[in-house]
Amino acid sequence: FKKRRPGVIVGRIIAGHGDTVAVRRGWLPAGAPILPDDPVFGDLAPAVLEDVLAGGRARLIGTGDRLTFIEPVLPLPRLIIAGAGHIGKAVARLASRLDFSVTVIDDRPEFANIRNVPEADEIILGEIGESVRRVEESPDNYFVIVTRGHQKDAEALRAAIGRDAAYVGMIGSKTKVELVHCEFLEAGWATAEEWDRVHAPIGVDIGSKSVEEIAVSIAAELVEVRAKRREPARP
């Protein structure tokens, strides 16, 4: 779980002789093989465990002399905020209350610290583009790029664009976004298809002006994207 892997926790109560019972429990990461002689998982159908994970709901199964409780463990989606300035701080504050695991990246010690962003689950002090590049790959990553300038934004975007992520968004006016768009395509840093997946200008258009309003618009877009990803696929 510390490695952000989804999986299931299984608890089993098995009737023995007389009034005795055996209690067994264990953790199984998603995709891990099940050995036939495993005392906890051995006789469980992999499809049952996969269904619990896919549905995100616990299941209680009673069969014969045993009772089995299967609980999914789904790590929170990871929000990576490039930039710990006023907007980055405000987004971190909101996202921490919206069931995101928040990582904040900045190259300035006076910003990349727990006093500045106390709501962050992880703070990375380092060169912004390289730090974004080193973020572990996951389809549940959400990248929000709100650094202090055009160059830093572009560096962070180069590291995030084209990755298997749920969301990549960059702050900026329509003029700035168009300049970055042209720069990326002309330099070969992104394909047109990759650029089309970038949310820029970032956030839901609510006419936001203040830092807090901008943060609300960004948080709303994050929640919207996450909700759409959770919708069951239509046949």
Segments from the language model and where they lie:
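Alpha-helical elements of the RecA-like P-loop NTPase motor core of helicases
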Residues: 89, 154, 178
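Short amphipathic alpha-helix with an adjacent loop that forms part of the alpha/beta core around
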Residues: 129-139
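Adenosine-phosphate binding glycine-rich loop
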Residues: 166, 170-235
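A short acidic, amphipathic alpha-helical/loop segment
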Residues: 94, 155-160
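Conserved SAM/SAH-binding loop
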Residues: 126-131, 151
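ADP-ribose/adenylate-binding Rossmann-like module
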Residues: 105, 142, 147-150, 158-184
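Segments forming oxygen-rich coordination pockets for charged ligands
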Residues: 1-107, 111-124, 138-142, 183, ...
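Short beta-strand segments
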Residues: 11-15, 145-147, 171, 199-201
